[in-house]
């Protein structure tokens, strides 16, 4: 009872945390970033895959720097924006900077010598203007406008080189600066993934010479008829289809449980709840992404429902694998001491890490805690490795030729393959596929999850066809018969 109360309190706290952060999560394409007293040299503002006629609207409503007006910083081009064009979202950029401007003549992809095309927007505080400089053929004719508009069509129609803007106004209001520009991808050659940075190049980070900045910037990314990045456009349909698949699987599993209701155990109902919550999570996610694509902003109610569903789904899925691996309800009814310790440590960590992953995924790239995303991913992998321990212990505790040992080994391979495909292969696929096909990583993850659910349902279906349940019972009965027989023979011999 105490454990149930603690679990309920823990889940209530996590749901409260989700509701608090739901409003700050900004997985949308009309969004903004506000940083204060930040001394990072490069602040990532966004990454987006643009198709032809796509636009990126940048509205800097407030910028200030913590140096005196007479400082040399106001006579140098130390601050500004940098727009990079890359092949795909997963490209790692090597920032090779110079001491003078923080912007080198060439910025390279990690591990390559290919110079990336870029546009720099350097602030000139003396002239109150922004100097626009282009580097690379891919952005040579990129249309940049200073006209305020909806982000869809308020751009010049003439794309001749001589009409390309080279300066933009920089508004000064008592030391607080503001600016606006609109980037328009007019041709097929300009399609691709773009990354936007803010540059703070006044002295090395953390030194006396460095300057902290306050920055508020609003961004609107838009493709024709859609606010989603090119690789995200098919995602709503993908998750609607996944919803139908998981719902069908849940109905099928419910029918199996009803048919063999005399042999059903509690773990079977937990498995059903996992599939149901997976279906709900896919549905809420699909609706949320659909509204983002249509309106540019997520509907808060669908976002919160998605966070709650994915939290319950992840927690129940994790617990299910732990219980199946330990054999609870099948080959034993009580956890061992080391299994209790493992459960008490890993499950809360996994729940908190799931929350962290959701918050990081929904946060702005430029927010400080976004940089901790890799730690959350590593913790997730650690938790999945940890849940293999009960499986290994169960395998070692079985007889060499027992059917249960064979089934444990199969389950072990299933989990290893699932973790490898959804944590490693999905990551590699997302960071290596062309920007139009980034949705393939989501497809692979959903297919892998669906296959695992089917295999788990088949392997651990209710008796009398479940070897996992059937064999240990026979083994226990045999042992009991041997004990009774030996005891009876011994008693008879002693009486004689």
Question: Where are the model-predicted features located?
Answer:
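Sequence-level detector for tyrosine residue identity
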Residues: 27, 42, 74, 78, ...
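Soluble extramembrane domains flanking the early transmembrane region of eukaryotic membrane proteins
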Residues: 4-233
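Generic detector of multi-pass transmembrane helix bundles and their immediately adjacent loops
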Residues: 297-496
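Residue-level marker of positions within ordered structural domains that often coincide
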Residues: 63, 201, 259, 330, ...
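Hydrophobic alpha-helical transmembrane segments corresponding to the first two to three helices
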Residues: 209-351
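Structural signal for hydrophobic/aromatic residues that build the beta-strand cores
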Residues: 58, 194-198, 254, 325, ...
